[in-house]
Every structure is written in C-alpha cells, then in structure tokens.
Amino acid sequence: MRVIDGSYGEGGGQILRTAVALSVITGEPIKIINIRAKRSNPGLRPQHLHGILALKELSDAKVKGAKEGSTELEFYPKSTRVRHVKVLIKTAGSISLVLQALLPAMVFAEEEVTFEITGGTDVAWSPPVDYLKHITLYALEKLGIKVEIEIRRRGHYPRGGGFVIGKVYPWGTKRPLVARTFDKIYSFEGISHAVRLPSHVAIRQAKAAKEALERVYPSIPIKIHEEYYEQGKDPHFGPGSGIVIWANTDVLRLGGDALGERGKPAEIVGREAAKALIEQLGPRHAVDKFLGDQLIPFLTFAGGDIWVSEVTKHLITNVWVVEQFFGRVFEMEGEIGKPGKVRVVKKVEL
C-alpha cells in the first residue's frame, strides 16, 4: 500500500484531493498519514470529506478513517463503473473543490459520468464554479477532455444551497498542452452576479471591473454579463454576490474573481477582480496562478509544457503528490510567488 504524508508543504486538502483521485485512476490503495498535522485543528474537516466520499462513490471504494478529525485515511478503490455521482454538501462547502477531486478520476471512467452537487458555488478560499466552467474547462478541452457544467442555482456562505449538474465524457485522445506565453488578448469577458440583493449590486460590480480594465487595456473589448433576479422570483438561499472575469488570449484564458461581503461596496468587489486579473496578465505567461495546480493531474497523463504567471504552494504540492505515485514526471523552474515553468519530462501511460 502506498503511504502519502499528509503534512507535506501546506499539508492541506490539496494532498487529499489529488492523492485519492490518483488512487482511483490507478486502482492502487493508499494510506494518507499526518492529515493536516501542522494545522491548529488537525485532521479531516467536513469540506475534505465531501471530495473523499464522492470518490468513494465513484470507485465503489472501501474507506477507513473517513470521519471528521481523523489524521489517517485508508482508501481501497475498486472500479469506476458508476454512471452518476450525487454529492450533498449541507453547508456552503465548495462545489469547485469537490469537482477538483472528482474530475481527474471521472475522465478515466469507461463511460460518461453525470454528477449533481449541492453546496457553495461562490465561496472564499476556492475557485468559483464560473471560473471552473469558463477557464479550467477551456484549458482541459485543449487536452482532449470534454466536460459540461451547468449552474442551476448559486450557493454562498453561510447557507449554501447551490446546485450544479454536469457530465464528464471518457478521455479519448490525450493531447499534450503547450501553453508558454501569449501574444494577444482578444477580449475580456465575465459574469457579475447578485442573488437576494438589488440588481444594482451586480451592475455596479461589472461597471467597476470594466472601468479598471479599460484604464490598463483601453482598446480591448469587454463584455461582462450581469446576473440578477426579480424579488419573489429568486430561487437562491442567498444573499450573495461575486464576479469572475477572464481574458481571452491566443493561447488560453486567464482569470480573476472577487466575492461580495456584507458592508463591502460593489465597486470594491469589481475592482478587486480586475486587479487580480491584471496581475495575472503582467508576466504574459499563458496559465494563471489559479489554473496551474488544477492542470497538474491531467498533464501527468497527457504531457505538456506550461508557463504559469505565479508558482503557488498548491502547484508544488500537486507535483509532489503525483511524483509520490509515479516517480519523476515534471521539471519545474521558478520560486513561490514568482512566474514559473512546468514541463512534463516523463508522461505516465496507464
């Protein structure tokens, strides 16, 4: 049985998501020890359990230690013959983080897999589902991966209640991804939403983001969709707001996002998202810092060479987890917090 040290690096949920997904892909049982050992509240938290239990359902696995506070987890996968996965997160736990665990394993299923997940679509410390849908999936398509995601209802902290459905197709031809530098930004797009709030919140967020982008990129077209609901016809548990914006370049899309909070003016939310995106575009590297770590499990099997706007701890952790399974796969350049490069030197064939 392969043993993974859950305290490596940041020692957070990233190790769990990637290690258990790779266990499902390879069919190899794993034991994760020292889970979140360096944290003030060590062991599994509820948000980590959702991803693990979803992967358990997908692979009909036997699991030991999948409970809150547990610092060790054993996972024995069987096969990915399940056709539908349903995950119910009772809080505003992140739907995106559950999908980050599920997607790498789902693409290796023999047939299409559908999913439905209830929880948080737009919550702190995780990419919004809009980011996953418009930026992550766009990049995965270049690798030959087809995934459909539909946001039926948004969910915000603390009430959650977001509802996302989708379909993952078996990964056929694995195409390497070469995404080094971009030359041209064709346009900016985005989605600014406000639920159980006045429509002007979404409108002001979008306007502030547009103005901030125009100051730096005056000649590039910008189109930000404003999403809001009539009082009495709003299906959300809410209230909540947020904005995701992205640059369409000649290579991939780079993104930035921000969340509304009680007492935080909509203009600040819009400007925060624009600032995050502008920072990602500065080095002219084709992969933004939020996407880099998400691509690692897929690049392992497809090959490629990506240049990231910023090396993050999450990126380094994901490379480390992959190499616990397969030995040396990647070559990396760059320090944490600086632009960097990640190249596959030994693609894994299953």
UniProtKB/Swiss-Prot annotation:
The keyword Amino-acid biosynthesis does not apply. ATP binds at Q100, F290, L291, G292, D293, Q294. Pfam families: RTC (PF01137), RTC_insert (PF05189). Belongs to the RNA 3'-terminal cyclase family. Type 1 subfamily. This is RNA 3'-terminal phosphate cyclase. Catalyzes the conversion of 3'-phosphate to a 2',3'-cyclic phosphodiester at the end of RNA. The mechanism of action of the enzyme occurs in 3 steps: (A) adenylation of the enzyme by ATP; (B) transfer of adenylate to an RNA-N3'P to produce RNA-N3'PP5'A; (C) and attack of the adjacent 2'-hydroxyl on the 3'-phosphorus in the diester linkage to produce the cyclic end product. The biological role of this enzyme is unknown but it is likely to function in some aspects of cellular RNA processing. HAMAP family: RTC.
